[in-house]
């Protein structure tokens, strides 16, 4: 081998080069992990502005109550507006769909109202349970109160209360006397002492039994103890 190349490809130099490459790869991997963490944190805090979106026609219960059979299409349009869905293949049907979104999230639920015509006259109309204008404002307001501000997200405060899970009911242990037939003798209770009863600190003396009194014993006067 050429003496010059022999010095270049020496084991010591190759080891240094290998360690350098491994170090560069490790630093690159760590920086990538840090960048991903920072990006996730920034996306959580600094969210792009998303305007409120109202899709369709808001139909309140007050508007729905004004519909009557026999109305013309123009009268329906004046009350409820131009329908969101008016198919060319279903000219006798107008579909009103309403949905409200705030910050990309749906507030409330999607509601539908359908009006059927025969020519230019209303013959039928149906729809979901519709809120009043006051109820819709309250529904949107409750959603706004559930959202946290920028500072609350940073400080991790003002979280919504978490409902604790329901406690599981206790399992009842079946008694030994539940399945006994009528008139059967009840088994005696276990009166054996426990392990700690063998020690003097926990062993209790049995209660002194009262003397059994026979006939005439209540009239006997106890004798004084002999003095020594």
UniProtKB/Swiss-Prot annotation:
It is a lipid-anchor. GO terms for molecular function: protein-macromolecule adaptor activity. One of its GO terms (cellular component) is Bam protein complex. Residues 1-29 form the signal peptide. InterPro entries: BamE, BamE-like, BamE_dom. Keywords: Cell outer membrane, Lipoprotein, Membrane, Palmitate, Signal. A lipid is attached at residue 30 (S-diacylglycerol cysteine). It is found in: Cell outer membrane. It comes from the Bacteria. Residues 197-228 are annotated as: Disordered. HAMAP family: OM_assembly_BamE. Part of the Bam complex. This is Outer membrane protein assembly factor BamE. It comes from Polynucleobacter necessarius subsp. necessarius (strain STIR1).
């Amino acid at each position: 081998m050429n003496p010059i190349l022999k010095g270049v490809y020496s084991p010591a130099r190759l080891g240094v080069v290998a360690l350098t490459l491994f170090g560069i790869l490790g630093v690159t991997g760590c920086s990538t992990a840090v960048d991903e963490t920072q990006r996730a944190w920034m996306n959580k805090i600094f969210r792009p502005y998303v305007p409120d979106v109202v899709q369709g026609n808001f139909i309140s219960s007050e508007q729905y109550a004004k519909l009557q059979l026999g109305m013309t299409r123009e009268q329906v349009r004046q009350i409820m507006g131009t329908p969101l869905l008016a198919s060319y293949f279903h000219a006798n049907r107008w579909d009103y769909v309403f949905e409200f979104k705030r910050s990309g999230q749906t507030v409330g639920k999607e509601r539908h109202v359908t009006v059927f015509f025969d020519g230019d006259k209303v013959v039928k109309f149906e729809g979901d349970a519709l809120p009043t204008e006051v109820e819709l404002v309250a529904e949107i307001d409750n959603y706004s109160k559930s959202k946290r501000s920028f500072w609350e997200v940073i400080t991790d405060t003002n979280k919504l209360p978490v409902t604790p899970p329901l406690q599981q009911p206790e399992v009842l242990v079946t008694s030994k006397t539940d399945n006994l037939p009528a008139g059967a003798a009840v088994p005696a209770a276990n009166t054996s002492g426990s392990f700690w009863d063998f020690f003097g600190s926990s062993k209790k003396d049995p209660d002194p039994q009262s003397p059994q009194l026979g006939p005439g014993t209540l009239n006997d006067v106890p004798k004084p103890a002999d003095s020594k």
